[in-house]
Amino acid sequence: MAWASSFDAFFKNFKRESKIISEYDITLIMTYIEENKLQKAVSVIEKVLRDIESAPLHIAVTGETGAGKSTFINTLRGVGHEEKGAAPTGAIETTMKRTPYPHPKLPNVTIWDLPGIGTTNFTPQNYLTEMKFGEYDFFIIISATRFKENDAQLAKAIAQMGMNFYFVRTKIDSDLDNEQKFKPKSFNKEEVLKNIKDYCSNHLQESLDSEPPVFLVSNVDISKYDFPKLETKLLQDLPAHKRHVFSLSLQSLTEATINYKRDSLKQKVFLEAMKAGALATIPLGGMISDILENLDETFNLYRSYFGLDDASLENIAQDLNMSVDDFKVHLRFPHLFAEHNDESLEDKLFKYIKHISSVTGGPVAAVTYYRMAYYLQNLFLDTAANDAIALLNSKALFEKKVGPYISEPPEYWEA
C-alpha cells in the first residue's frame, strides 16, 4: 500500500537523535499496512504514542560541592535561581540524601541532585547503591577547576554497572577570564578550551578503559561551548520513546534545540494523523468534538514548548524594556489566524467540515478533515518554532521593523 511507503519515507527524514520511534516499530507498522491489517497497525501506533506520552525520564546530577550542580540543574529545568522550587545555589552541601527537582512543565521529567561522593563515607559502589542508581536513565558528573579523583572513581563504578554517564566540566567562563587576565599577551581561547578538555580526558582515561567524551559548559550562558553537543549525545543514547520528552524539556536556547523539538513534535503529529487516517470511518461528529476542542490547546502547548507562552513573553518583553503588545508585532504566531472579521478558527473549520460532509459524505469527509487537521498542527508547529528561532537574535528581528503579520486564510477554507 502507498501508506507503507509514505510511512517509511517520512521517518527517513529524521536523524537518529531526533527519531522518537524505534526501527523495529517502524518496520512492524509498515508490515501490517502492507498486509492490509490496519487494526493491528493502529494498535502498534497507539502503543508507540502511549509510550511517548507517558515515558518517565530521571536524570541524576552529581559532583562535589561548589562545582555548579545547582546552577546546572536549574538551567536544565529553565528555572531562575530565585524562583520557587529552584535548587539552592551557593550553599554548603549538608544533606546526604538525593533531592528530586521535577521539571516545571513536564511532570514526567525529574532531575535528581545527588550529594557529591566526597561528602559521603561511601565507596563508589556503595554510593551508587545508596543513591538507587538503577532508577536513573543516565548520570551527569559535574566537575569544576581541578580534577577530583572521586570523579574518576565514580565514573568507573557507573561504567562497571552498565550505566551511561556524561562528564561535564563547568565554570568555563571563569577559566577563560582568569587566563586572559593573567596572560593577556599569549591568551588563546581555543587553546585554553582544548587544554581543559585534554586535562579532564587524560585523568578519566587513567581510571577507565575507554576515552569518554568531556563536555565544557558555561554557567553563565549554557548555549555556549559544548552544551549543544551534550544535548545531541544524550538524545542519541536515549531509547527512542524517551527522546520526545527529553527534547521538550530543553530550553529553546539554540536553533539546534528548537529543531529537535520541532522534529519530535512533527513525528508525533504524523503518527496521530496515520492512526486517524486508518480509522477514518468513525462517526464524523465525534471527530469534530474531539479535535476541534483540542486545536486551541494544541497551539498553546506548542507556544509553551518553544518559550512563547504568555508568561515567557512577559519576561522577554520586560528584559527588552518593551510592552508585550509592541513585542508581539514582530512575531508571527499571535497573528496566525488574524482576520478582518472575528470568526474563530473553530468556526471556520466547522463551516468547512459541514460543506465537505454535505458534498462527499462521512468517510471521505473524515479523511479530508484529518488531512486538514494535520496541516494545521504542522502550521502551528512551524510558526512557533520559527518565531523561537527568530528570537535567538532579537536585535535583528526588531531592526526589520515589520508591521503586524496578518495571515491569509488557507485555500481550503473556501468551498
Swiss-Prot record:
EC supergroup of this enzyme: hydrolase
InterPro entries assigned to the protein according to its UniProt record, in alphabetical order: G_IRG_dom, Immunity-related_GTPase-like, IRG, P-loop_NTPase
Modified residues ((Microbial infection) Phosphothreonine): 89
Keywords, ordered alphabetically: Cytoplasm, Endoplasmic reticulum, Golgi apparatus, GTP-binding, Hydrolase, Immunity, Innate immunity, Membrane, Nucleotide-binding, Phosphoprotein
GO BP, one annotated term: innate immune response
A Pfam family this chain is assigned to: IIGP
Tissue-wise expression: Expressed in thymus and lymph nodes, predominantly T-cells. Not expressed by immature CD4(+) CD8(+) thymocytes (at protein level). Expressed in IFNG-stimulated macrophages. Expressed at low levels in unstimulated astrocytes. Due to sequence similarity with Tgtp1, it is impossible to assign unambiguously experimental data published in the literature to Tgtp1 or Tgtp2 gene.
Gene3D superfamilies linked: P-loop containing nucleotide triphosphate hydrolases
Keyword Membrane: yes
Residues reported in the UniProt entry to bind GDP: 66, 68-70, 90, 171, 173, 219
Its EC number(s): 3.6.5.-
SUPFAM superfamilies: P-loop containing nucleoside triphosphate hydrolases
Induction details: In macrophages, up-regulated by IFNG, but not by IL2, IL4, IL10, nor TNF. Up-regulated by IFNG in lymph node cells and thymocytes and other cell types. In astrocytes, up-regulated by TNF and IFNG; when both cytokines are combined, the effect is synergistic. Due to sequence similarity with Tgtp1, it is impossible to assign unambiguously experimental data published in the literature to Tgtp1 or Tgtp2 gene.
Membrane topology according to the record: Peripheral membrane protein
Annotated ranges, domain IRG-type G: 55-237
Superkingdom, natural source: Eukaryota
Disulphide bridges, residue numbers: none
Residue spans crossing the bilayer: none
UniProt modification remark: (Microbial infection) Phosphorylated by Toxoplasma gondii ROP17; the phosphorylation leads to disassembly of IRGB6 (TGTP1/TGTP2) polymers into monomers and dimers. Phosphorylated by Toxoplasma gondii ROP18.
Subunit structure as annotated in this protein's UniProt entry: Monomer, homodimer or homotetramer in the presence of GTP. Forms higher order homooligomers in GTP-dependent manner. (Microbial infection) Interacts with Toxoplasma gondii ROP18.
Family: Belongs to the TRAFAC class dynamin-like GTPase superfamily. IRG family.
PANTHER family with a match to the protein in the record: INTERFERON-GAMMA-INDUCIBLE GTPASE 10-RELATED, INTERFERON-INDUCIBLE GTPASE
Protein name: T-cell-specific guanine nucleotide triphosphate-binding protein 2
Gene name as annotated: Tgtp2
